[in-house]
Amino acid sequence: MDISRKTDYALRMLAMLAEDPERLLSVRTAAEEVNVPYSFARSIQHGLVQAGIVESLRGVHGGIRLKVSPDDVTIRQVVEAVQGPMVMNDCTAPDGDCARMGTCCYHPLWAGAQALMRDYLDSVSLGDIVAHRQFPAVDSKFADRDAFPEYATCTCACREE
């Protein structure tokens, strides 16, 4: 799982919009303010519009603005809007193909890590980040080791038979 530069730029652009939710911002201005090439910013805009996070208005006075409250946009939604589904390993992808599915000792590890990452990023909203730039809200369950899910006992000895 890699958080791409595209996601980083998307979050910066969204932070600008979240500071003034009624503000209509041209993509060119957003690109200049976060120091990203215009064509790259347009690609980011497309993903955010498709996800319903921002709306795009055409015309000489057009631009983008948040379509929903910053408090209703999770960081996971942004990540998945610009870079697709979050997966820790190919075997945990929605259409993942693994020849060892059902016998691999590591699949539960990757699936658990993926679930924790998704839950964590779902627990933090764009509003949390904008309001608390240095201290984003973190669900306390992530600090509690007892809250981690349990997995079936591995019986494959983690090697090919």
Give the positions of each predicted feature.
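Short helix-capping/hinge SLiMs at alpha-helix to coil transitions
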Residues: 18-22, 68-69
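Alpha-helical residues within the helix-turn-helix
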Residues: 32, 49-50
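Short coil turns linking two alpha-helices in DNA-binding domains
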Residues: 37-40
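Conserved segment of winged-helix/HTH DNA-binding domains
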Residues: 70-95, 106-116
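A short alpha-helical element within helix-turn-helix/winged-helix DNA-binding domains
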Residues: 28-35
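Beta-hairpin "wing" of winged helix-turn-helix
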Residues: 52-67
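C-terminal regulatory/oligomerization modules of transcriptional regulators
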Residues: 95-161
